[in-house]
Design a protein with these regions (language model features):
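N-terminal signal-anchor module of multipass membrane proteins
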Residues: 1-51, 272, 284-285
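Long, contiguous internal "core" modules enriched in hydrophobic/ aromatic residues
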Residues: 5, 10-15, 31-32, 75-76, ...
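Membrane-helix interface motif
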Residues: 19, 24-29, 61-63, 154-161
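Membrane helical hairpin/interfacial module
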Residues: 33-91
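General alpha-helical segment detector with a strong preference for membrane-spanning helices
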Residues: 56, 63, 85, 186, ...
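Juxtamembrane/interfacial segments flanking transmembrane helices
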Residues: 60-68, 122-127, 192-198, 283-287
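C-terminal structured interaction module
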Residues: 263-298
């Protein structure tokens, strides 16, 4: 599939925002942190949500028609995401302003629902084997929580310094778990085999069939939208890059930082760069069955 940067930014930004909010609300319930820490964290979470929502509009051919997306909520996970995302944003704002844990609990439920909606947009597609797995949902949640925790550490240094250490330790654990599950997903996807072949696509049982031409010389919507257009060495390089950046690099910085705000911010920046690479690879890795026909170009 073709990685669209608007969707990459949407999913990574709102994932970090969701993770940050869940951590802050859990702390508010369990530890009663300073109010300015909660308000600052909710403000950052809202800013990330707004940025992600703004990025998503660049993926629309007609942004003025975006409101119509809600009409298909009975059958479309995308429509459900369009409903849940602004509802979650509104409840985060209410929680930050009102100090109401009831509002926070509603926001937490909406946050989890948003994880489900976003992940299921991809996991429900049975013909894309790389996505059609519960690991898609698990990865979205774990990577979101890990990035939210990594972002919470420098915010704690600013407003809740006595808890920055435990948060850094939690970020290490969440990052390690997210990394392990993502590696498990890579191993699973590497073992997948196409359910269709060129023989089954054209209904001929001849074992040796080679495509010589596809009827036109240039590209088309299909070859642009359903293939990333990059050679295998590029995919391999991106895979190793995100595996290094989403956990080992930020974990090393957090361990070496000694409570430094600048180092913790750098750890989040590195991890977020890794998340962008991971999400690009997530889309590029998915092999659309239609490329059996367009294989001379895809």
């Amino acid at each position: 599939m073709r990685p669209a940067w608007s969707v990459i930014l949407l999913t990574t930004l709102i994932g970090a925002a969701q993770g940050l909010f869940l951590i802050v609300f859990a702390l508010d319930v369990l530890r009663s942190p300073p109010r300015d820490f909660v308000v600052l964290s909710c403000g950052i979470s809202l800013a990330l949500l707004v940025a992600g929502l703004a990025a998503s509009f660049f993926h629309l051919g007609h942004p003025e028609r975006a409101w119509r997306a809600v009409a298909m909520w009975r059958t479309s996970w995308l429509s459900r995401e369009v409903i849940v995302l602004p509802a979650f944003m509104a409840m985060v704002l209410v929680y930050a302003v009102s100090e109401s844990r009831v509002a926070g609990a509603i926001a937490a439920v909406l946050c989890l629902a948003l994880f489900v909606c976003t992940a299921m947009i991809y996991a429900c597609l049975k013909f894309l084997q790389e996505w059609h797995t519960p690991l898609t949902f698990v990865n979205f949640v774990l990577l979101g929580v890990a990035s939210g925790l990594t972002l919470a550490v420098p915010l704690a240094v600013l407003r809740y310094p006595q808890f920055a250490g435990p948060l850094a330790l939690a970020a290490f654990g969440a990052g390690a778990l997210a990394w392990i599950v993502r590696v498990a997903t890579l191993i699973r996807n590497a073992r997948l085999r196409p359910k269709s072949t060129i023989q089954s696509a054209i209904g001929i049982a001849q074992p040796k069939i080679a495509q010589k031409a596809q009827g036109f010389m240039g590209g088309s919507f299909n070859t642009r939208e359903f293939f990333h257009g990059k050679p295998k060495p590029v995919l391999g390089a991106v895979r190793w890059l995100f595996l290094a950046l989403i956990f080992p690099a930020p974990a090393w910085l957090q361990g070496w930082g000694g409570g430094s705000l600048e180092v913790f911010l750098a750890a989040f920046a590195l991890q977020f760069a890794g998340l962008l690479a991971e999400r690009w690879y997530f889309f590029a890795e998915a092999r659309h069955p239609q490329n059996l026909y367009y294989q001379s170009m895809a």
